[in-house]
């Protein structure tokens, strides 16, 4: 039986120790539900096995600070300002971006082949900020140690976890080293929503063209293409679309386009 602990509001030392070790894999609460967190190739392999998931989607990199995001992902000033706005307002946001060449080389230099599981065929990943305190604490601390944290929702592929730890399923629970519980925290983020109406995931915005290249700066121009594309709706979609409109004259909405 996998050990369960309650998140106490501060950094989970047990979770940190597991992720710092080799092949560690935990379940952690976020603003929208539970995720599987890991920090190396062995852990990523366990994540895919636990979820029985295909491997064509971009991996999710959890950024514990804006400095980490800037160190890893290619950004332009408009995209960086867009992220900063969501950071300052504590809004969950994930964008599909290419890696900085030097950061990708560092990823490959780990020598375990994790880059194959972290990127899609175009070499992009989804870089996520403000995903929830428990995970942010772990990601920030591990980044201080030079380690990145990778994630996937902790539910059988194609099914939601309903924001409750019992929704992660036996297969995932049995495949990880630790489950950090915080059902109350998850519920507190969407207090006016029911199980049926709550968002199960965060918003995802593609900031790359069809070949995975970073979209150009718009600089106030109109009818720019390629432009940002909202490819997944989710928590705070209304605020994020407002920020898109404030930052970019052109952006698109294509629910599910990537997947």
Could you say what each language-model-derived stretch is?
Residues 1-259:
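Active-site-adjacent structural elements in enzyme catalytic cores
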């Amino acid at each position: 039986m996998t050990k369960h602990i309650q998140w106490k509001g501060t950094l989970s030392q047990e979770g940190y120790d597991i992720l710092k070790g080799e092949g560690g894999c935990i379940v952690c609460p976020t603003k929208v539900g539970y995720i599987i967190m890991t920090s190396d190739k062995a852990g990523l392999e366990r994540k895919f096995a636990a979820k029985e998931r295909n491997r064509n989607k971009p991996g999710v990199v959890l950024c514990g600070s804006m400095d980490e995001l800037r160190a890893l992902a290619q950004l332009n000033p408009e995209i960086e300002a867009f992220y900063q706005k969501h950071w300052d307002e504590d809004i969950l946001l994930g964008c599909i971006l290419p890696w900085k060449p030097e950061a990708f080389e560092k990823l490959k230099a780990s020598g375990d082949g994790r880059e194959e599981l972290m990127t899609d065929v175009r070499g992009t990943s989804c870089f996520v900020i403000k995903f929830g305190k428990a995970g942010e604490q772990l990601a920030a601390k591990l980044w201080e140690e030079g380690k990145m944290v990778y994630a996937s929702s902790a539910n059988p592929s194609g099914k939601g976890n309903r924001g409750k730890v019992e929704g992660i399923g036996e297969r995932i629970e049995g495949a990880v080293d630790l489950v950090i519980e915080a059902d109350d925290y998850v519920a507190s983020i969407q207090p006016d929503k029911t199980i049926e109406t709550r968002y199960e995931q965060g918003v995802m915005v593609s900031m790359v063209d069809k070949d995975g290249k970073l979209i150009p700066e718009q600089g106030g121009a109109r009818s720019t293409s390629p432009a940002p594309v909202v490819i997944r709706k989710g928590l705070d979609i209304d605020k994020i679309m407002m920020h898109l409109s404030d930052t970019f004259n052109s952006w698109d909405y294509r629910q599910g386009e990537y997947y």
